[in-house]
Amino acid sequence: MAYRKRGARREANVNNNNRMQEKDNEKQDQNNKIQLSDKVLSKKEEVITDNQEEIKIADEVKKSTKEESKQLLEVLKTKEEHQKEIQYEILQKTIPTFEPKESILKKLEDIKPEQAKKQTKLFRIFEPRQLPIYRANGEKELRNRWYWKLKKDTLPDGDYDVREYFLNLYDQVLTEMPDYLLLKDMAVENKNSRDAGKVVDSETASICDAIFQDEETEGAVRRFIAEMRQRVQADRNVVNYPSILHPIDYAFNEYFLQHQLVEPLNNDIIFNYIPERIRNDVNYILNMDRNLPSTARYIRPNLLQDRLNLHDNFESLWDTITTSNYILARSVVPDLKELVSTEAQIQKMSQDLQLEALTIQSETQFLTGINSQAANDCFKTLIAAMLSQRTMSLDFVTTNYMSLISGMWLLTVVPNDMFIRESLVACQLAIVNTIVYPAFGMQRMHYRNGDPQTPFQIAEQQTQNFQVANWLHFVNNNQFRQVVIDGVLNQVLNDNIRNGHVINQLMEALMQLSRQQFPTMPVDYKRSIQRGILLLSNRLGQLVDLTRLLAYNYETLMACITMNMQHVQTLTTEKLQLTSVTSLCMLIGNATVIPSPQTLFHYYNVNVNFHSNYNERINDAVAIITAANRLNLYQKKMKAIVEDFLKRLHIFDVARVPDDQMYRLRDRLRLLPVEVRRLDIFNLILMNMDQIERASDKIAQGVIIAYRDMQLERDEMYGYVNIARNLDGFQQINLEELMRTGDYAQITNMLLNNQPVALVGALPFITDSSVISLIAKLDATVFAQIVKLRKVDTLKPILYKINSDSNDFYLVANYDWVPTSTTKVYKQVPQQFDFRSSMHMLTSNLTFTVYSDLLAFVSADTVEPINAVAFDNMRIMNEL
């Protein structure tokens, strides 16, 4: 971890820990210019363990006299035996959804509010297209007719596939649906205008060009196009633009314009956007220097709470979210400053312990792993774990009494729920059997695995000493208080911890323990415990300050959290070495550190953006699931929808999420109501599916099968063809149902009775206008007579197939030859383009400016950290 250290002396005789610190100090200047997030995650985290002490002692062995070597080797031996003697297994489950990488912080910070892309075109499904008209004898006329056709014709065949196409179209509309529209940004010049007027977008302009140049266009329409221009109402900040749109496209764009998400922005909104506890915190000085224009707008973030309850029964997903929150929180916890010099503190501790020759085995361990990096790391871990509600596990060695005494401070200030139970029980049992029970001469506690009571709860009932029992009672009842602040569930620390008074309670208990006789233990044992307690009690003032500092930083950063802080144990844990807790207790200085305003705003913005994106993606997923059900997509893989939802949240490794959680998530999403805008858009698509199908060149809507030949009919769009334009008089059977049941008896019976039958459903419909290429592909003898007697250029062949098992049929219509067929394709007529009914006026604001980062208007500073006060209006750190 990056940290600052003053007054550190480097001795020539550097051990392994010092070398690690030197590397950090060398990198310090380089890291100063790096952003806070980069600085925190600039290198792999180092955890200080007791193994480092073994290396340290081994180094000292080489440089000491033979006599000291023997004594220190004895220490090593004893340590190893103790490590092997007590090993408590920490519950560790593998988590499949997330690998903690530094990239997760970048992913979180890259989630920005959806900037409405600068819209250059309106949303369109249709475009007008010119098609030739055929005479009664099959010849093309010189005239053309305009029809509305699909811009992007990707309609598949098969009823189910077509419904899936509409679901994908809906998904596309949801993706493209703008938060706001400014028509002025997309308007282009109308080339045919008399007075340099503008139309709404380039496609409208190109349609106007094509119609203007069409010889058959009426003069009145040309005159109208020449008059087409924008109409500005400057006093109302409104502008109207002419547009040419299919009625369905007009309905979409008009809906987008009427339901924009932008809202007026003023100073009050920005002021209220800042978390209330930051506004009211006297340590932060906030100013707004700028008056916003009347055209200022913003998009309110979507911060609905707890619609999926991922903490409830979604272990893998919850673990991923808490892990990413933990990494983010660590990046914003301030670094400790002006820690006590490690070397000076170790020397002072050695003097207090009277360890001239380091002869007492147990007390040599008191100095293990103490360094400023471990202290800083511990400070960050504790605050970040509480902010993200990550469960912690404790690593310690039972023979290191100093670690256990530091652990007593840790268990006093951090609620029990923050530790995984197995780890908590192991630590409490070690404290009880090493310190508490021996002090009173009580028998060693034999704890049964699975006991509903913790060792401290049992010890509280059995301890006669009031002060010790009182402290045990506090620890046993140290839980977060759940408080709803600004609509967000917060986990708040006990007031006695926030003001540091609980440390006096801890010290009273420790003093009582140090005064006991330890009747069943040797004198050296008693003396070791007493000296360990003395080391901690000498720093009473600093420990009170440290507790207040920890609580203040936690609560200040907690004000920037926007999602409910649900407390559920996580699958994986954050490891905490008790030696690093000792480092924190022994090295904490008197310099106050509080988060900078820029850090707070950054943390708040990242939380808001993630939360808003989370809710928007939920809305999308709920809408798609509802649409799939309404479209009767019985085979639609809901898992794919849920996977897509998780991918859009950016922090999940979706391939590793267990299937059971996917399906549980699907069930939760199904229970949620659809957001109004998304529901209205779906209803627009649902009502106009028929019109969209008609406009496709790729599919027909059915086929008529007969036992006897049916004469082909003349069609204006295709000549003489086997195309039917209505199904009047035919009995209709649904093709999808027919294929699903596989019962063709009904069709057979009808055909045998000489009754044509209409099979209704989406079928391939392909036209090919190149007759030469068609004949080249087929046996020329089929068309011999036709080619001989007629002009090839006037032929209009049509290829269609009923299903994959049937043959392809080519039918040719020309002149007076009237062929017959036993099948007809049912193809609905696309909508004709009519200029008057397609001309619409669209209205939007003439201009406005959308601001995404509201906090950019706020200039913020802090008081001098030394003067910073906590919630009780007293300085955070009083020990000067």
UniProtKB/Swiss-Prot annotation:
Biased composition regions of type Basic and acidic residues, renumbered to the chain: 20-30
Keyword Repeat annotated: yes
Post-translational modification: Sumoylated with SUMO1 and SUMO2. Sumoylation of viral proteins seems to have a positive role on viral replication.
Domain of life: Viruses
GO molecular function annotation: RNA binding
An annotated GO cellular component: viral nucleocapsid
InterPro entries reported in the protein's UniProt record: Rotavirus_VP2
Annotated site location: Interaction with the intermediate capsid protein VP6: 220, 224, 228, 839, 841
Residues covered by region (Disordered): 1-38
Annotated family: Belongs to the rotavirus VP2 family.
The protein's assembly and partners: Homodecamer; each decamer is made up of two conformers of VP2, called VP2A and VP2B. Interacts with a VP1-VP3 complex. Interacts with the intermediate capsid protein VP6. Interacts with NSP5. Interacts (via N-terminus) with NSP2.
Protein name: Inner capsid protein VP2
The organism of origin for this protein: Rotavirus A (strain RVA/Human/Indonesia/69M/1980/G8P4[10]) (RV-A)
